[in-house]
Amino acid sequence: MWEVIIMKTYIGKIHLKWCKNCNVPLLGRVCEVCGSKAEEVKLTPPGDPRLGFQYDMDFINKILEEEFGAKNVLNGKIILLNKIPGNEEAYEIIVDGEVKYLIYFDEDKEKWKVKLKLNGAKDLMEKGAYKKIIKIKNDVVEFLKNRKGSVLRPGIVEFTDDIEEKDDVIIVDENDRVVGVGLAVVSSEDIKNMEKGKVVKVRFFIKDNEDYKPGKIYDNLEEAFDLMVRANEGVIDNYERNAIGFIKNTYEKIKKPVMVAFSGGKDSLVTLILTLKALGKDIDVVFIDTGLEFEETLKNVEDVERHYGIKIIRLRGENFWEKVKEYGIPARDYRWCSEICKLEPLKKFIEENYEDDVLSFVGIRKYESFNRATKKRIHRNTYIKKQINALPIFHWSSLHVWIYLLREKAPYNKLYEKGFDRIGCFMCPAMEMGEMNKIKREFPKLWEKWENVLREYAEKHNLGEGWIKKGLWRWKHKRQ
């Protein structure tokens, strides 16, 4: 069962706001299209939501349909996915300027599940939900209104026969109006045999004088994204101006050859664009091919070269598939792969091509992790002593990055349109189970190659199938 890990502090300022009139996310105080005042959006820390594409919309729609029977719930809306800390992969789904659903990957059931917010349930019923519904007496509604409590068996009029223990359910009154959502503590089969007792632990229930109106619907995402870009134009201009100023000032102070580390990801692409605008093309752009990259990433390197008329230097480390036989399975607490496949080829390149220090502009953002948030904006690489790292987009949120890329019509990696949060090695041990499940589904041959390595290792070291199936290989010290 998914549980949130409470964060005591945010990594930084939460930039996300919303224009309820245009129904688009905002980064400033006012919508630059209609002039409406931006409204706050409550998020779980660290609060760095990413933009949802059509794949994400279809994926979440499918989960909602499987759970509640409602179809195409999110169509015509901009959605954001806020990844939140927990013992399993989980996202808050932001629609119409509020969190309406929380989806999480249930590792025991190996499927995605949903936790409901009240307005999310209202949207589901509007779209024809017919599963996991409990109808209660109107006098019970009046009793539960404006207070927390539970739905008891005597107060239930009827219920659907598909409810399992620990399912989220929609609570409606005798007029089929959504009045609450909560967690079923028993199954439909149990309810049939009960005369009294608790059935639903209520999470949210209607209050007096509540008014709910769904947001504007767009014909397509392209139209919605275009308006979102225009609604944030001035904010993005300001962030671009500050980042370019940082790059120019840093270069003037340090006066060393310039390199941009390009990974095929969105953050490094923004950093490359800004550096080209600030300093021109007389820079080195370096891509490290670990041998574990997706084909889409390798293609993106070519697309970026062609789009900006530059040559990207490709570095290659030692063969991972040979080294894994020597070092064993890489893990979160045993990251030999980063050193051998990434850092060593870069270190060798810098040693051979620069007499002195090199100024490297890197797409690190503080919102990515607490570890990254502690970095100084200009610092020397502790592993590669000649590399001085500078971070132009350190204070940018994920939404700043996406709006900038859309405005620039930049050739971003198409993996993002397949629901990927990050771009990197396809079998990185830092992944969650939901991410691995997606790679297995989208890239079966690639994942099969890795599972064959895991299986061979497991047999050699007397590790059970659960070590692979439950993702225990991701920790070196969980192998026993």
Curated annotation (Swiss-Prot):
Lineage top rank: taxon: Archaea
Keywords assigned by UniProt, alphabetized: Oxidoreductase
All copies of domain PUA, residue ranges: 131-207
Pfam families the record matches: PAPS_reduct (PF01507), PUA (PF01472)
This protein's record includes keyword Aminoacyl-tRNA synthetase: no
Residues annotated as transmembrane: none
GO molecular function: oxidoreductase activity; RNA binding
Gene3D superfamilies given in the database record: HUPs, PUA domain
Record keyword Protease present: no
UniProt xrefs under SUPFAM superfamilies: Adenine nucleotide alpha hydrolases-like, PUA domain-like
Record family assignment: In the C-terminal section; belongs to the PAPS reductase family.
Protein name, as recorded: Uncharacterized protein MJ0066
Species for this entry: Methanocaldococcus jannaschii (strain ATCC 43067 / DSM 2661 / JAL-1 / JCM 10045 / NBRC 100440) (Methanococcus jannaschii)
Lineage: Archaea, Methanobacteriati, Methanobacteriota, Methanomada group, Methanococci
